C-alpha cells in the first residue's frame, strides 16, 4: 500500500517546497523505495497553460501532453519516475469534476458542499495520481500542497490531507512543513515567531507536522532550533535547518545529514536500505570544479523573470556538469535589440532563443539570429527560436524579404510559419487539421517520436530518431521548404505522418553549428544524464571559444 508524505508551506510563498519535496524523494529513492510526487495547485485555472509566465513561471509539459506546474520539472530532474497529467491538479479541475458529477446526478440530489464532496474528490485525485506511477506499486507518494497555510484557497486541500491521514490510519501519512526563519539585520538575529505562528495555524486545521524544514539565509543554530522545538511541540531532531545553497543539487545531502529521511521512514514504518547519495555528490563536485567557462546569451522577452525558463536554465547547467564547463547565462531583452544595441552580443560564446508566444520582441530575436548566423556564433533555437531562425533565413538568404509567421502578420506575402490549419500543400491546396489529428487541434502537446535524416548534425546528436515533447500552435510551412532547402537549409527531422519539419540546421559550409528544434528538449534533461543536444551545444561553444582565442 502506498504511503503519503504531504509537504506544506507557511509564512510566505516561494520558499522552495518543490525542491524540498523533490530532494526528499531523491533520498528515499536512493534508499531503494519506489517514489512518485504530486503537486496540488489551489488556483481556479484548470491548468497553467493559458497563464502568463510573469504570473506562474514556466509551464512544464509532461510526456503525455499535460501542461503543468514547473515543480513537476524539478520532480523529474530529481527522481527517475516520469510525471503524468495525474501528477498535477488544480482547484479548477476539482470543481469541474464535482460539477460534472452533480449535473449527471451522481450525488443523488444531495446538497453539494466543500466537505465532503470537494475534499473527497481531492482525496480521489491524490490516490489516483499515486496509483498511476510504478504500476500502482509506489512505496511513497510525496504530495506538495501549493500556497501557504492560512490561505483560504488552500484550506480544502489541507482538510483533504487531514481526512486522508485519519482514514488511512497511523503510519500511513506524514507531514513535512516548510517555513521561514527570517534574519533581521537591525537586530542581528534570526526570528522564530513566524514559524511558531505557522505551526499553530497548521494545528488549528488538525495537522501536526512530522518534521519542520526551517528556511533561512544561514544555518540555524541549535539554540534557535531548540526554541522552535519547544514552542512548536516537535522534537528538536525534527527541526531541520535548510539554508540558502548555491546549488539545488546540494539539498538532498543537506536533508539527509540532518536525518529527515530517517524521521519519515520511522513515521511511516519503513525500513529501507541506507541512503546512497554518491551520484549527487559527484554532480555537485563536477559543478564546483569546472575546467572551462563559457557565456551563453539567452535572448527572450521574459528575461526579467528567469522562472519562465527554469527547465532550460537547468538543462544548460546539466550540460555544463557533463562537459566540465561553467555555463554563465547572459539574459538579453529582445526588445532592446530592436533598436540596435547588438554590441551586447559580441562577448558571447553562443546564442540561444527559447520558446515563447506573441509578437512582442520577435524582431529583436530575429536580429540576434542574423548576428549569430553571419558571425558564425553557435546558435540553438527552441520552438519559437527555430521558427524565427527559419524566418530570418527566408528573409536574408532565400530572398523572401517579407517572410514572417501568421502569428505575427496575417498578411505576410511569405507565411513560412503558420497554423496547421493554414498550410498550403505541394498541390496548392489548403492543408486541414482537426482535433482528431495527431496530438490535437492547433496545439501540439506531449512527446512524439520522429526519424532523423542521416548524415546530419541531428543524427550525430540523437542517432536514428528523436523522442521529445512539444508545446506549440505554429509550424514551419511545408510549402516553402523546397525553396529554403534550395538556399542551403537542411531539414534534418520530420514527423513520420504529417511530414512536419521538426529540426533544421545549416551545413558546415555555411555555419559551424546552427540548429533549430520545434520541440522542447529542456523538458527531458536530467542532472544524472544531461541531454545530448545541450551537451553538443556547449561543446560547440567551447570549440568556437578555442578558435577565437
Curated annotation (Swiss-Prot):
UniProt enzyme class: ligase
GO biological process terms, semicolon-separated: 'de novo' CTP biosynthetic process; pyrimidine nucleobase biosynthetic process
Chain positions recorded as Mg(2+) binding sites: 71, 144
UniProtKB keywords: ATP-binding, Glutamine amidotransferase, Ligase, Magnesium, Metal-binding, Nucleotide-binding, Pyrimidine biosynthesis
Annotated residues for binding of CTP: 13, 151-153, 191-196, 227
EC number: 6.3.4.2
Gene3D superfamilies hit by this protein: 3.40.50.880, P-loop containing nucleotide triphosphate hydrolases
Regulation: Allosterically activated by GTP, when glutamine is the substrate; GTP has no effect on the reaction when ammonia is the substrate. The allosteric effector GTP functions by stabilizing the protein conformation that binds the tetrahedral intermediate(s) formed during glutamine hydrolysis. Inhibited by the product CTP, via allosteric rather than competitive inhibition.
This protein's pathway: Pyrimidine metabolism; CTP biosynthesis via de novo pathway; CTP from UDP: step 2/2
PROSITE patterns per the UniProt record, alphabetical: GATASE_TYPE_1
Family as reported in the entry's similarity comment: Belongs to the CTP synthase family.
Protein's UniProt name: CTP synthase
